[in-house]
Every structure is written in structure tokens, then in C-alpha cells.
Amino acid sequence: MAAKDVVFGGEARARMVEGVNILANAVKVTLGPKGRNVVLERSFGAPTVTKDGVSVAKEIELKDKLQNMGAQLVKEVASKTNDIAGDGTTTATVLAQAIVREGAKYVAAGLNPMDLKRGIDKAVAALVEELKKQSKATTTSKEIAQVGSISANSDESVGSIIAEAMDKVGKEGVITVEEGKSLANELDVVEGMQFDRGYLSPYFINNPEKQVALLDNPFVLLFDKKISNIRDLLPTLEAVAKAGRPLLIIAEDVEGEALATLVVNTIRGILKVVAVKAPGFGDRRKAMLEDIAILTGGKVIAEEVGLALDKVTLEDLGQAVRIEIGKENTTIIDGAGQAAEIEARVKQIRIQIEEATSDYDREKLQERVAKLAGGVAVIKVGAATEVEMKEKKARVEDALHATRAAVEEGIVAGGGVALLRAKQAVGDLKTGDAEQDAGIKLIMKAIEAPLREIVANAGGEPSVVVNAVLNGSGNYGFNAANDTYGDMLEMGILDPTKVTRTALQNAASVASLLLTTEAMIAESPKAEGGPAMPDMGGMGGMGGMGM
């Protein structure tokens, strides 16, 4: 086992604070509408240019092990805030740095770190309550667009395309971000339920122009096994033919004689039928078949529920207004399922989302909710170069997260104003314990940091602006984009409450850990340069070559 260095007390904290400062100073230059760019080296290809705080934080690894520990803890603040709220990473980093810097002074002056921590926790709890009171629900498309624009570093085109996407697929719908092919951002919306399986034979195509099979007012047969024997299908086909309507068969697979018979019937015009494979694999396939059954008002024909293929009646089949089957996708529009049953299914999947442990499972479950609840929108990001594309895509994804957070918990005045107003409302919070009160005072000073940083990045004088904002009331604040004062909400400068709240809570949590650190253990640095090479026999005069 390698030897370790152990560092105690003030020295340990001082080294950690140095690491915190290095990381925070690199991240905080990106804050605000006039935030600067940071260039990240890439081992291959062109460097990446970004204004995204979490991207900068993720790149930082320091040579000094103790400094690096401090930096990594603050990196945790940024990434945790990003995971929960999707934005606010730079704000969280700036707050963490301010709390650590103020707190380190108090600890150095001999105050008890544990009492300081208790004071910090009380102040944060009071501020969070106040933020919730200030919060205003996000209802209009305009507000959604403003939140998106602010998060995408004041890019209005991003805000408006996110608002449009939410309009089309609803607040719960799935919105994905992809790299586009053109210079401008584009929005594609798929209404109804779409899954990634197409027709099993091109002979099913009845619209040669679009190369798709269109079924109007069809029945839907859902079967969880392979169909290879046409005899099992005959009763269903006869009943559907009598009703004079088309049929979509979704099964694990349709092969051999069964597929050939369906194709022949379609070509001869005896029956309009299309077969597709069921989406997904294993348990996910079962769940998705069940989703389609609920959406279309049918049943999944499976032996485990006592239903056999040759005993199927028209009542067991699902129905839809229209189904479009392409080479790779099938879209069911306006299924005949009961709204209450669909709603119950969505609730059930939401519970599974909360319990899901992996991001992959969570994402797949969210897709299922969207398919049942409304549709899927795809934002295609346009850019001139690959470097710009990467930077823009990251910003659009951030903006999308922030917008979802705004819809979830509402909005507060942006630009660091909400925290100052919360500070004023909490007023003179006292606990009766001098050291805990010092913790409260420390937080009340630290929450000015985001506004100070925004002003500094815009080339202004932070103290002057902070005093001017504190003398105002309500949503009165400073617009760094054009150096004016006014109502932040009216100027469209807003932050999702969830983002501001999460940034404050995570920053205080990690800063408290740093302040209550009393010892640090890190591997000792290895001595530079190995031992000299031994004499090389037979090569006189070259012995002891220093390497």
C-alpha cells in the first residue's frame, strides 16, 4: 500500500479552499448574459468553446491532491444541481465558493464549525421557504420561452422553439434534442403513439408515394408470441373481413405460411391487413404491448391471461382512427382507449420512474409516458461547424431542463434578485447562540455572490448594484444585458424556483462539509525520476547512465 500524507486542521482547510477557488474562478466567468467563454482542450480535433458551467467544472483535475479534493467536492455541487434541476450549475458553484470563503474566516477565528453548520442549515431552510413564497406558476408560452432563453445564455430562438415544442406535445410530452442537418434550429413533432417497428413485408404498402401503409379505422390485434400457422388467425381474419375494416397485427413475429397468406390476401384486395413486430424486448416488450392495448382499448392475447389466438373475438381487438406504418416506424393516431384507463396507466408508470435506479430505465419509462400522454417532439439543432454544434446542443439541453423545472415549481425573479429578496424577507433571523448566528450571517452575505458575479462579468461595480437592488422592492433588479434597472419578470429575466432552490441547498451542503473537515488523507507524491541505470556489461564507459 502506498504511503499517505495526513494533513490536519487549518492547513487542510486552507489547501481545500485553494482548490475550491481554482475551480470556482474558472466556472464563474461564464455567469450572466455577459459571461465569458472558456476553451477546453481536446486530445483529438479542435478545442471546445463553452459557456456552460458544468462542462467547465467536469474538465478540472488539479495536480495537488489536497487542492483537488476541494475542487472535486465543488464539482459535485455543480453536477448534482445539474442532475436535479438541469441548470444553475454556475450559480451553485459561485454560492459554494462564497460560503466556503466566508466560513473559513470564521473557523480560522476559532468558531466551532459544527455550530456554524447548524446556523447555515437554519438560514438555508428559512431562505428556501421564502423562495417558495415568491414563486409564481409558469403558465404562458411567453414565460416558458423566457426561461428557455435565459438558460441558453440569452438565445431567444432556443426559448421560442422549446415553448413551441411544449405547446405541441404538452408539458409532460417527451422532447428530445438531436443534431440537425441545416443551419437553423428545427422542430419535428410526432403525434399519437409511435414505436420503432415497421411493416414485415413491403407488399403491405398501399400508399406508394409515401412508401407507407395507411389504415383508416382499423382493428388492432396484439399477440405476445410468434405467429407461423395461419389456421390460428383464420377466425379473427374472417370476423374482421365481415366487419369490412382493415387490421393491424402486432406480434413477436409473423413468419412462414402466416405471413405469405396475409400478403396474398392484401395483394388480391380480399383483406387490408398489415403485420409488424412488437416493439422492445423481454419484459419491456410486454409492458409496451400492454400500453398499446390500453391506448387502443384492446387486450393483449396471451396464454398467461387465458386468451388463445384462435378464440379471439372483435371485442378483444383494439381500435384507432388511423394508423400509419412505414419501413421503420408505426404511428397510432387517436386510439379508442378510455381516457381514465390511460391516465391510470400513466400514473402507474410515473411511480416506476420515481423508483427507477438507472438513468436508462428512467429514460425508457419517460418515453412510455410521453407516448401515452401526447407525443414526442424532436428539436434539431442547426449550426455551421461541429464545434458550434456541440456547444449549441449542450445549451439547448440545459434550457430544456430549466424549462421543465420552471413548469414543475414555478419561477422567481432572475439575475440573483430572488435570493436578495429572500434575504430581506427572512430579515434578522436569530437563534440565541452567537456561533449559530455567525453561520446565519455568513449565508446572508454569501447569497449576494451570484448578483455580484453577474455584474463583475458585465464590467460593472458589484457593490453599487447590490445596494441599488436592496433599496428596491419586489422584482426590481439589474439587467446586465443592457445595464438597466427594472422589474425582472417584465424584462423576461427569470429563473426556475427549483434551480435557485437546488443551487442554494447543494452549495450549502457541500460548503458545510468543507468547513467541518478536520483532517485530509492523500497519497504521498512519488519522487521524481527513477534510480540510475545499472552498469551495462560490455559497454565500458557507459556505466551509471543517469536517466
UniProtKB/Swiss-Prot annotation:
Its main location: cytoplasm. It is an enzyme of class 5 (isomerase). Belongs to the chaperonin (HSP60) family. GO terms for biological process: protein refolding. Its EC number is 5.6.1.7. The keyword Cytoplasm applies. Together with its co-chaperonin GroES, plays an essential role in assisting protein folding. The GroEL-GroES system forms a nano-cage that allows encapsulation of the non-native substrate proteins and provides a physical environment optimized to promote and accelerate protein folding. This is Chaperonin GroEL. GO terms for cellular component: cytoplasm. Forms a cylinder of 14 subunits composed of two heptameric rings stacked back-to-back. Interacts with the co-chaperonin GroES. Keywords: ATP-binding, Chaperone, Cytoplasm, Isomerase, Nucleotide-binding. It comes from Delftia acidovorans (strain DSM 14801 / SPH-1). The gene is groEL. Coiled coil: none annotated. One of its GO terms (molecular function) is ATP-dependent protein folding chaperone. It comes from the Bacteria.
